[in-house]
């Protein structure tokens, strides 16, 4: 028996000694393969380019503003004006008790007179405070973005400086673009990029306060990125949203006001068709609202209209029905202030103004009405917790029991 084990050992011995050498060789081959394979930096470069583009492009979504740039209702509006800087802090995977406690802390801050009820006036004050937080956040971001497009640090950004940075974010060589602009040579860009550039330039003109010099200060650049910060740019934003895609001259904004008499490129859409789903960044190209009869005001059918023949199934029909229902409610209860069935430029501008105190009071009443189960025109802790999804975007379970826990 002993001799048999010795014989086996003598036969397997060379192979056992070979194992470490094989493993070493395999590791070396894998390392060489990894080294020879070209590193995939394209996704990294793409993410960096997208980040740069997003930083210098006016955003399609503005926190605390009722409409998106494409004319959609802002679905997150109520959470934005209720949570302010805490927006995004109530994800559903967060520990529920901690989220409920955080919500009750907010409740106590809104409830100024500590009667454990939130009145419309208290909610109005809170909405204005949270909107101011979004304004401050936008100002801080704009300062950072301004420095990115003001390479010489002279406190002014020219249209050409901005154009170079924008095209560089789209993948063009910054040096080649700068040289072409300096030599007044034609730039070769695709049709969509050209259309975005034309819209941006028109917006640049509008943000350039008189006397017009095509140079934006830091304050003007803020208005360029965030039109809600400027009365004139808010008016321009309304015009962009309701402009008829097929008719560049059909807009709800009416005649240009002082300082708007500048000649900029036209911004006509390629067709009058209203598209169902905009592509990313298309707030600068397409509009969702259309003044279909060109009378420079919006009727209810115009505000709720959707393209005919685009519903493919029952789910799509349900989406359309919800679209019409939501927009009809918004039109009748909030936008059409004199209830004559017509929305004028002034009414829409007032509705879009995030710092309008009258609007904030109306919104406060609307928000209370959603959760006011006992119909006392106030919000109580149980109601806020039960309707937590409306206020925070997250559904917090066991709301009734948690009231006693948190208080």
UniProtKB/Swiss-Prot annotation:
<comment type="similarity">
    <text>Belongs to the CREC family.</text>
</comment>
<dbReference type="Pfam" id="PF13202">
    <property type="entry name" value="EF-hand_5"/>
</dbReference>
<feature type="modified residue" description="Phosphoserine">
    <location>
        <position position="99"/>
    </location>
</feature>
<keyword id="KW-0479">Metal-binding</keyword>
<feature type="binding site">
    <location>
        <position position="113"/>
    </location>
    <ligand>
        <name>Ca(2+) 1</name>
    </ligand>
</feature>
<feature type="binding site">
    <location>
        <position position="295"/>
    </location>
    <ligand>
        <name>Ca(2+) 3</name>
    </ligand>
</feature>
<feature type="glycosylation site" description="N-linked (GlcNAc...) asparagine">
    <location>
        <position position="40"/>
    </location>
</feature>
<feature type="binding site">
    <location>
        <position position="336"/>
    </location>
    <ligand>
        <name>Ca(2+) 4</name>
    </ligand>
</feature>
<dbReference type="GO" id="GO:0005509">
    <property type="term" value="F:calcium ion binding"/>
</dbReference>
<feature type="binding site">
    <location>
        <position position="378"/>
    </location>
    <ligand>
        <name>Ca(2+) 5</name>
    </ligand>
</feature>
<keyword id="KW-0597">Phosphoprotein</keyword>
<keyword id="KW-0325">Glycoprotein</keyword>
<feature type="binding site">
    <location>
        <position position="161"/>
    </location>
    <ligand>
        <name>Ca(2+) 2</name>
    </ligand>
</feature>
<comment type="function">
    <text>May regulate calcium-dependent activities in the endoplasmic reticulum lumen or post-ER compartment.</text>
</comment>
<feature type="binding site">
    <location>
        <position position="374"/>
    </location>
    <ligand>
        <name>Ca(2+) 5</name>
    </ligand>
</feature>
<feature type="modified residue" description="Phosphothreonine">
    <location>
        <position position="217"/>
    </location>
</feature>
<feature type="binding site">
    <location>
        <position position="291"/>
    </location>
    <ligand>
        <name>Ca(2+) 3</name>
    </ligand>
</feature>
<keyword id="KW-0106">Calcium</keyword>
<feature type="binding site">
    <location>
        <position position="154"/>
    </location>
    <ligand>
        <name>Ca(2+) 2</name>
    </ligand>
</feature>
<feature type="binding site">
    <location>
        <position position="338"/>
    </location>
    <ligand>
        <name>Ca(2+) 4</name>
    </ligand>
</feature>
<protein>
    <recommendedName>
        <fullName>45 kDa calcium-binding protein</fullName>
    </recommendedName>
</protein>
<feature type="binding site">
    <location>
        <position position="302"/>
    </location>
    <ligand>
        <name>Ca(2+) 3</name>
    </ligand>
</feature>
<feature type="modified residue" description="Phosphothreonine">
    <location>
        <position position="310"/>
    </location>
</feature>
<feature type="region of interest" description="Necessary for intracellular retention in Golgi apparatus lumen">
    <location>
        <begin position="354"/>
        <end position="407"/>
    </location>
</feature>
<dbReference type="InterPro" id="IPR018247">
    <property type="entry name" value="EF_Hand_1_Ca_BS"/>
</dbReference>
<dbReference type="GO" id="GO:0005783">
    <property type="term" value="C:endoplasmic reticulum"/>
</dbReference>
<dbReference type="GO" id="GO:0017156">
    <property type="term" value="P:calcium-ion regulated exocytosis"/>
</dbReference>
<dbReference type="GO" id="GO:0005796">
    <property type="term" value="C:Golgi lumen"/>
</dbReference>
<feature type="compositionally biased region" description="Low complexity">
    <location>
        <begin position="249"/>
        <end position="259"/>
    </location>
</feature>
<dbReference type="InterPro" id="IPR027240">
    <property type="entry name" value="CAB45_EFh"/>
</dbReference>
<dbReference type="InterPro" id="IPR011992">
    <property type="entry name" value="EF-hand-dom_pair"/>
</dbReference>
<feature type="domain" description="EF-hand 4">
    <location>
        <begin position="323"/>
        <end position="358"/>
    </location>
</feature>
<feature type="region of interest" description="Disordered">
    <location>
        <begin position="249"/>
        <end position="282"/>
    </location>
</feature>
<feature type="binding site">
    <location>
        <position position="115"/>
    </location>
    <ligand>
        <name>Ca(2+) 1</name>
    </ligand>
</feature>
<feature type="binding site">
    <location>
        <position position="372"/>
    </location>
    <ligand>
        <name>Ca(2+) 5</name>
    </ligand>
</feature>
<feature type="signal peptide">
    <location>
        <begin position="1"/>
        <end position="35"/>
    </location>
</feature>
<dbReference type="Pfam" id="PF13499">
    <property type="entry name" value="EF-hand_7"/>
</dbReference>
<feature type="binding site">
    <location>
        <position position="297"/>
    </location>
    <ligand>
        <name>Ca(2+) 3</name>
    </ligand>
</feature>
<feature type="binding site">
    <location>
        <position position="293"/>
    </location>
    <ligand>
        <name>Ca(2+) 3</name>
    </ligand>
</feature>
<feature type="binding site">
    <location>
        <position position="111"/>
    </location>
    <ligand>
        <name>Ca(2+) 1</name>
    </ligand>
</feature>
<feature type="binding site">
    <location>
        <position position="122"/>
    </location>
    <ligand>
        <name>Ca(2+) 1</name>
    </ligand>
</feature>
<feature type="binding site">
    <location>
        <position position="376"/>
    </location>
    <ligand>
        <name>Ca(2+) 5</name>
    </ligand>
</feature>
């Amino acid at each position: 028996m002993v001799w048999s084990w010795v014989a086996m050992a003598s036969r397997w011995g060379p192979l056992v000694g070979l194992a470490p050498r094989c493993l070493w060789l395999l590791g070396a081959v894998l390392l060489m393969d990894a080294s020879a394979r070209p590193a995939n930096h394209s996704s990294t470069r793409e993410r960096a380019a997208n980040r740069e583009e997003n930083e210098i492009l006016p955003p399609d979504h503005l926190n605390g503003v009722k409409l998106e740039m494409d004319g959609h209702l802002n679905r997150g509006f109520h959470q934005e004006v209720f949570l302010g800087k805490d927006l995004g802090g109530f994800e559903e995977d967060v520990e529920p008790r901690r989220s409920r406690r955080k919500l009750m802390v907010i409740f106590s801050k809104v409830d100024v007179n500590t009667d454990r009820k939130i009145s419309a006036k208290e909610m109005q004050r809170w909405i204005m405070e949270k909107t101011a937080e979004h304004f401050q956040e936008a100002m801080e971001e704009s300062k950072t973005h301004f420095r990115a497009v003001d390479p010489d640090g002279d406190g002014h950004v020219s249209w050409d400086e901005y154009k170079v940075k924008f095209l560089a974010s789209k993948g063009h060589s910054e040096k080649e673009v700068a040289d072409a602009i300096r030599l007044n040579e034609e730039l070769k860009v695709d049709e969509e990029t050209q259309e975005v550039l034309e819209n941006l330039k028109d917006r640049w003109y509008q943000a350039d306060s008189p006397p017009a010099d095509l140079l934006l200060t830091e304050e003007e650049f803020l208005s360029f990125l965030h039109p809600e910060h400027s009365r004139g740019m808010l008016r321009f934003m309304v015009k962009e949203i309701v402009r008829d895609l097929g008719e560049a001259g059909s807009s709800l904004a009416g005649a240009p006001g002082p300082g708007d008499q500048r000649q900029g490129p036209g911004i006509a859409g390629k067709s009058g068709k209203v598209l169902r789903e905009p592509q990313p960044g298309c707030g600068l190209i397409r509009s969702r609202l259309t003044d279909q009869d060109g009378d420079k005001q919006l009727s209810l059918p115009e505000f709720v209209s959707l393209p005919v023949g685009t519903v493919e199934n029952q789910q799509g029909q349900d989406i359309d029905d919800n679209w019409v229902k939501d927009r009809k409610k918004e039109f009748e209860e909030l936008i059409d202030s004199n209830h004559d069935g017509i929305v004028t430029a002034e009414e829409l501008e007032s509705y879009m103004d995030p710092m309008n105190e009258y609007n904030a009071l109306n919104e406060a009443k609307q928000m209370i009405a959603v959760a006011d189960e006992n119909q006392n025109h106030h919000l109580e802790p149980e109601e806020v917790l039960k309707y937590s999804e409306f206020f925070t975007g997250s559904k917090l379970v066991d709301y009734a029991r948690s009231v006693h826990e948190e208080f």
